[in-house]
């Protein structure tokens, strides 16, 4: 059994979906993610450290994936969700209209910039996760999480798994996803 306590305030975005439904779908996906990461050495760590024993595993997974996967889930399991709002794609669309295909390096897209508007980790992650599900098998992200729990001793296990599953580096996967979005919007 799992338990989740949600202390919420009203949603600040206009959405047709009830806010608590969207929030519970999103947060429940994080519960599923941590359950998938609670394997191997990290499971042993939870016996010693309680719920905090899984923290190193979560630290090996990029934040964009954790949040993007949760937004992807909330969008797919409801009639609303942020992935269905045009404003959610605005940073990507604006950039592609102004500059064409990415002139900024991957790290600037990922980490943001004080000078240029960039998507946050929810938007960045939703684009990456959604493209991964569209282009590759639905097991791509499951395999990446399993790789983290089986080989946490590698420097970046999540990215090694991504390369193994897709044949692309994280930067190449991002460029491919951005080019796909550009081609869809140009149709």
Model-assigned labels for residue ranges:
Residues 116, 144-187:
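Beta/coil-rich, acidic/histidine-enriched accessory regions frequently appended to metallopeptidases
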Residues 1-56, 62:
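Juxtacatalytic substrate-recognition/specificity segment
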Residues 13-25, 59-67, 118-126, 133-134, ...:
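Solvent-exposed, acidic/flexible segments
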Residues 22, 71, 126-130, 134, ...:
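Solvent-exposed, polar/charged alpha-helical surfaces in well-ordered, non-transmembrane soluble domains
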Residues 72-103, 139-146:
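Short helix/loop segments within enzyme catalytic domains
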Residues 27-44, 69-88:
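Catalytic Zn2+-binding segment of zinc metalloproteases
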Residues 50-56, 109-114, 125-127:
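Flexible glycine/proline-enriched surface loops and loop-helix/loop-strand junctions
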Residues 56-60, 112-119, 145:
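Active-site rim elements
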């Amino acid at each position: 059994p799992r338990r989740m306590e949600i202390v919420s305030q009203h949603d600040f975005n206009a959405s047709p979906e009830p806010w608590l439904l969207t929030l519970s779908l999103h947060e429940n996906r994080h519960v599923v993610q941590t359950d998938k990461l609670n394997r191997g050495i990290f499971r042993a760590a939870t016996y010693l450290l309680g719920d905090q024993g899984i923290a190193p595993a979560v630290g090996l997974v990029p934040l964009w994936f954790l949040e993007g996967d949760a937004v992807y889930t909330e969008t797919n399991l409801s009639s609303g969700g942020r992935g269905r709002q045009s404003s959610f794609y605005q940073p990507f669309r604006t950039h592609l209209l102004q500059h064409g295909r990415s002139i900024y390096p991957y790290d600037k897209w990922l980490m943001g910039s004080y000078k240029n508007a960039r998507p946050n980790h929810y938007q960045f992650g939703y684009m990456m996760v959604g493209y991964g599900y569209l282009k590759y098998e639905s097991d791509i992200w499951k395999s990446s999480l399993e790789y983290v729990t089986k080989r946490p001793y590698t420097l970046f296990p999540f990215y090694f798994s991504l390369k193994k599953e897709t044949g692309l580096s994280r930067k190449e996967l991002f460029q491919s996803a951005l080019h796909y979005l550009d081609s869809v919007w140009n149709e």
